[in-house]
């Protein structure tokens, strides 16, 4: 069964190339053919941004599950198996159900032009509409305004995580254009929660949404981390201070991601839900999220796995290892639409050297030779390898 699924997913990637003009029309036409499942979903929390989307989603999901809610979630990309992307009522979709519904939607689409992300999003919405849940948490794949997840008509809460330069070929060449695309998820009458941003981004967002009647919560104004220690952080939400367990996920940026999730939960309380401080703390404590400064060991040597791939992500890695007073060898691969040289410049102070690899199964990955060439420009030692 897993081999059948992998084969079908590969067919969808081949038949429907990733690089295609951004539009919602193709997906809307397909959804209409399957009775518009995107209009039959539980209350939606929709998350856009550049960094921290997946972690914020995971904190929210674990807090909600701790409160005995059934939660659907849509996540991208996946780390190990495609099933990770679709959470049905607190559980990963089983392979047999995923395969059956992929085959069905593929047949309905009848090889009409559509991207891999669009057709798999159609499958996710179809599955979500067939099973009861209390909430659906959606993570955008790319941008917001024209992201496939943005076919939904209403959302209870819109969350904007930290925004950085990324996907410029689709979203625009500067941070303001990128921010504008991310804000495209904001729906009429939804509650807007804005995470910690660069000053220029916060100013732009305030101006952009000031005429909207939505409830708006900005990091630094309506909620803010007041202090942290080794076990807890204090979050001010409006005029009340909350003592929250530190996440088990490493890095100070994870405290910021957790604070964004807690702000969303506290807003839900204002809307009539009931999440106690104990539930919030237990949910934060139990949250796990692979590939985010995930610590392991190899022959008694500490190994960290992290998916940071843009300047802000690199800065968080830099801060973490500087705080540890450690330098590390970097086993490193990156897609060729990322700013490789800027990334390497940021992490150079904590880097003993780079082992350059090509990302397995990714045609659009930098080659080890290209990574090595950029390392040479910065006098970073680099060794080229075929794989990990």
Annotate each language-model stretch with its function.
Residues 18, 24, 28-32, 37-42, ...:
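ATP-dependent carboxylate-amine ligase catalytic core
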Residues 1-20:
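Charged, amphipathic alpha-helical linker segments immediately N-terminal to NTP-binding catalytic cores
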Residues 74, 191-196, 331-333, 352-360:
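Short internal beta-strands
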Residues 197-217, 229-232, 302-305, 311, ...:
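C-terminal helical cap/extension that packs against the catalytic core
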Residues 55-60:
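Hydrophobic positions on the alpha1 helix immediately C-terminal to the Walker A/P-loop
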Residues 145-146, 152-212, 340-342:
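Conserved catalytic-core segment of NTP-binding enzymes
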Residues 41-43, 130, 135-140, 146-159, ...:
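Nucleotide phosphate-binding/pyrophosphate-handling subdomain across enzymes
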Residues 45-47:
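Hydrophobic anchor at the beta1->P-loop junction of P-loop NTPases
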């Amino acid at each position: 069964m897993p081999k059948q699924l992998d084969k079908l997913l590969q067919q969808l990637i081949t038949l429907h190339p990733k690089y295609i003009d951004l539009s919602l029309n193709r997906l809307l036409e397909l959804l209409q053919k399957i009775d518009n499942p995107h209009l039959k979903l539980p209350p939606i929390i929709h998350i856009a941004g550049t960094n921290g989307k997946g972690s914020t989603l995971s904190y929210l999901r674990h807090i909600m599950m701790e409160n005995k809610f059934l939660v659907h979630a849509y996540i991208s990309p996946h780390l190990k198996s495609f099933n990770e992307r679709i959470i049905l009522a607190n559980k990963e979709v089983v392979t047999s159900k995923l395969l059956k519904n992929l085959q069905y939607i593929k047949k309905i689409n009848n090889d009409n032009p559509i991207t891999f992300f669009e057709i798999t999003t159609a499958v996710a919405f179809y599955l979500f509409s067939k099973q009861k849940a209390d909430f659906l948490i959606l993570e955008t794949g790319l941008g917001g305004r024209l992201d496939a997840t943005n076919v939904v008509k209403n959302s209870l809460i819109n969350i904007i995580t930290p925004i950085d330069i990324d996907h410029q070929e689709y979203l625009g060449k500067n941070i303001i254009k990128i921010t504008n695309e991310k804000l495209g998820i904001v729906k009429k009458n939804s509650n807007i929660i804005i995470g910690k941003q660069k000053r220029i981004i916060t100013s732009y967002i305030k101006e952009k949404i000031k005429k909207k009647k939505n409830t708006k919560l900005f990091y630094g104004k309506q909620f803010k981390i007041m202090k942290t220690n080794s076990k807890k952080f204090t979050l001010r939400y409006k005029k009340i201070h909350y003592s929250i367990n530190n996440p088990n996920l490493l890095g100070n940026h994870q405290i910021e991601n957790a604070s964004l999730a807690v702000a969303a939960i506290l807003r839900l309380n204002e809307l009539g839900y009931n999440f106690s401080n104990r539930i919030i703390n237990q949910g934060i404590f139990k949250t796990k999220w692979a590939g985010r400064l995930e610590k392991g060991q190899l022959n008694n040597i500490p190994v960290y796995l992290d998916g940071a791939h843009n300047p802000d992500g690199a800065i968080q890695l830099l801060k973490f290892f500087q705080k540890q007073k450690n330098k590390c060898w970097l086993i490193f691969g990156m897609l060729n639409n990322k700013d490789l040289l800027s990334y390497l410049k940021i992490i150079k102070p904590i880097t003993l050297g780079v082992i350059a690899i090509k990302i397995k199964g990714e045609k659009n990955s930098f080659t080890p030779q290209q990574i090595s060439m950029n390392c040479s420009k910065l006098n970073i030692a680099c060794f080229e390898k075929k794989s990990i």
